[in-house]
Amino acid sequence: MNGTEGKNFYVPMSNRTGLVRSPFEYPQYYLAEPWQFKILALYLFFLMSMGLPINGLTLVVTAQHKKLRQPLNFILVNLAVAGTIMVCFGFTVTFYTAINGYFVLGPTGCAVEGFMATLGGEVALWSLVVLAIERYIVVCKPMGSFKFSSSHAFAGIAFTWVMALACAAPPLFGWSRYIPEGMQCSCGPDYYTLNPDYNNESYVIYMFVCHFILPVAVIFFTYGRLVCTVKAAAAQQQDSASTQKAEREVTKMVILMVFGFLIAWTPYATVAAWIFFNKGADFSAKFMAIPAFFSKSSALYNPVIYVLLNKQFRNCMLTTIFCGKNPLGDDESSTVSTSKTEVSSVSPA
């Protein structure tokens, strides 16, 4: 084995070097230079300083503006809640540990950080699935006329949390475990070891199939059908400027949704899968650290894609920020009316 396994950790360096120490007790500067840990801390500070205001502002604006309390917007707010969880319980901890060069909070802190980060990421992922299914049902009409109501929205939100807990909770109860990963400053599920006491292999397979491959397949299918439906509608109404505009907006939103998710999470999932299927292979700490920390950026641009590109949310945000005045000069009332019409037709909401 080209790594060192200890109690509640796996360091991707052989102990034959004589350098390996517990990531809960000693700085891991033999894995990366101290300045690289400081760069990591700076990156996380950037995500915190941007992600918390954007996600927090989404929640504040929704609370202030009754017109935003539409069923579909509840799912968008759920995304902001997920992002806030990742920032408050994941990024802050990792920022602190990166400054120190090791996971100073111990195994219990590692389990809590890994759980909260996984929970936030999974809530966001399954929120996207609910959005995809809602758009598919409303636009493609496989069930005929369908109105997305508040009860549907709350059921969808409950579904996202149930699925997220089904993924994040098992390592807390003995099915796999959370251990430091990459540069040993953040924690995630144990892809690395074959410890029979934790049944890591069955958990990782379950997680990949049920909490990555399945939701990605649903997103691709539903948005693929959505684009085809919008294109067909545009072809039948070529003189309709509103339909053509709707096609462009939906296509742009679909591209941003799909690529935003894939860009954030596919590198991490790919590297984790490679490590899982090549246990004992030689790899550096940065090989896992880079995609792991890059995936955290989703907490920043998720609200940009799913909220700031929504005219209704954007105008209300600007009104809140500028104390009741919208510097863009958009008519908020007409925007709300347009937004409501688009939600029930072919817009990306």
Curated annotation (Swiss-Prot):
Residue segments, region Disordered: 329-349
Question: Which Gene Ontology molecular-function terms are recorded?
Answer: G protein-coupled receptor activity; photoreceptor activity
Give the record's GO CC terms: membrane
Which residues are exposed on the Extracellular face of the membrane?
Answer: 1-36, 100-113, 177-202, 277-284
Task: Please list every transmembrane segment annotated in the UniProt record, as residue ranges.
Answer: 37-61, 74-99, 114-133, 153-176, 203-230, 253-276, 285-309
Instruction: Write down which residues bear the modification named N6-(retinylidene)lysine.
Output: K296
Regarding how it is modified after translation, the entry says:
Phosphorylated on some or all of the serine and threonine residues present in the C-terminal region.
Query: Which tissues does the record link to its expression?
Result: The color pigments are found in the cone photoreceptor cells.
Q: Which GO terms describe its biological process?
A: phototransduction; visual perception
In what ranges is there compositional bias, type Low complexity? 334-349
Segments on the Cytoplasmic side according to the record's topology features:
62-73, 134-152, 231-252, 310-349
Top-rank lineage group of the source organism: Eukaryota
List locations, semicolon-separated.
Answer: Membrane
Q: Which cysteines are joined by disulfide bonds?
A: C110-C187
Q: Which UniProt keywords apply?
A: Chromophore, Disulfide bond, G-protein coupled receptor, Glycoprotein, Membrane, Phosphoprotein, Photoreceptor protein, Receptor, Retinal protein, Sensory transduction, Transducer, Transmembrane, Transmembrane helix, Vision
- Residue positions the entry lists as glycosylated: N2, N15
InterPro entries on file: GPCR_opsins (IPR050125), GPCR_Rhodpsn (IPR000276), GPCR_Rhodpsn_7TM (IPR017452), Opsin (IPR001760), Retinal_BS (IPR027430), Rhodopsin (IPR000732), Rhodopsin_N (IPR019477)
Q: How does it sit in the membrane?
A: Multi-pass membrane protein
Q: Which family does it belong to?
A: Belongs to the G-protein coupled receptor 1 family. Opsin subfamily.
- Task of the protein: Visual pigments are the light-absorbing molecules that mediate vision. They consist of an apoprotein, opsin, covalently linked to cis-retinal.
Q: What is this protein called?
A: Green-sensitive opsin-1
Q: Which organism is it from?
A: Carassius auratus
